From Swiss-Prot:
Species this protein is from: Homalodisca vitripennis
Binding site for Mn(2+) 4: 160
Entry binding sites for Mn(2+) 2: 100
UniProt keyword annotations, A-Z: Cytoplasm, Hydrolase, Magnesium, Manganese, Metal-binding, Nucleotide metabolism, Nucleotide-binding, Nucleus, RNA-binding
Protein name: U8 snoRNA-decapping enzyme
Top enzyme category: hydrolase
Length: 187
C-alpha cells in the first residue's frame, strides 16, 4: 500500500465503493415506476444515469451507418459508463442527474436538461440495495458536438471523468468488429 499515491486504498470512497463492483445480471430486477415508493426500493440508495444521443445516418468511411452518436465516459475507476451518479440527500433522481451532468459533462441544463419525459427504466440491485434510474436525452448532432467540446471544461474532467467516447453501432464485414467488439470489451 502506498500512502504517497493512494494506490490500493479507498480513502473517502470506502463507503460507496461496493456500488462500482461488477455483479451478475441476475442481481438486477426491473422495477415499475409506481413501485418505487414502496420498500425495499424507497429506502435503498439511488443512482441516476443518462444516455445522451443524437440520431446520425451519415456513413462512417462511406460504408457503415452509425444510426446514432451515443456518448459514454471513461470513468475514474477504469470502467466505461454513462454520465450520472448517486442521488444525494434532499434530491430526487432527476435533480441529481442534472447536477451530475453539469459536474461531469459541463452540460448547459438551461438548454438540455433531463426531465420526467426522459425516463427509460429503473433496475434494483438486490445485493447492493441500490436503485438505478436510467434516462435518455436526445439532442441534435450539432448539439452533441458542442456537448463533447464542453465536456473538456467540466468540473470533474480529468478526475472523476477521464474522457468521453462514442460507441460504434454498426457491424463490420467480419460480423465481429464494430458494435459486437464494443460489447465484448470489459467494462
Amino acid at each position: 500500500m502506498s500512502s504517497d499515491t493512494g494506490d490500493r486504498t479507498w480513502g473517502h470512497l470506502a463507503a460507496t465503493e461496493h456500488y462500482g463492483r461488477i455483479t451478475d445480471t441476475t442481481d438486477y430486477i426491473q422495477v415499475d415506476k409506481e413501485n418505487l415508493k414502496n420498500d425495499p426500493y424507497y429506502n435503498s440508495s439511488q443512482a441516476s444515469h443518462c444516455m445522451i444521443f443524437a440520431r446520425n445516418n451519415k456513413k462512417t468511411f462511406g460504408v457503415y451507418n452509425p444510426r446514432a452518436a451515443i456518448l459514454m465516459q471513461m470513468r475514474f475507476d477504469g470502467n466505461l459508463g454513462f454520465p450520472g451518479g448517486l442521488v444525494d440527500a434532499g434530491e430526487d433522481s432527476i435533480k441529481a442527474l442534472n447536477r451530475e451532468l453539469t459536474e461531469e459533462m459541463n452540460l448547459d441544463t438551461s438548454k438540455h436538461s433531463v426531465s420526467e419525459s426522459s425516463y427509460v427504466v429503473t433496475h434494483w440491485s438486490i445485493s447492493k440495495r441500490l436503485c438505478l434510474h436510467f434516462y435518455a436525452l436526445e439532442v441534435s448532432l450539432a448539439e452533441l458536438y458542442e456537448i463533447e467540446k464542453r465536456a473538456l471544461l467540466a468540473k470533474d474532467y480529468g478526475s472523476e471523468v477521464l474522457g468521453t467516447i462514442r460507441m460504434p453501432l454498426y457491424t463490420m464485414g467480419d460480423g465481429y468488429r464494430g458494435f459486437p467488439t464494443f460489447l465484448t470489451t470489459p467494462s
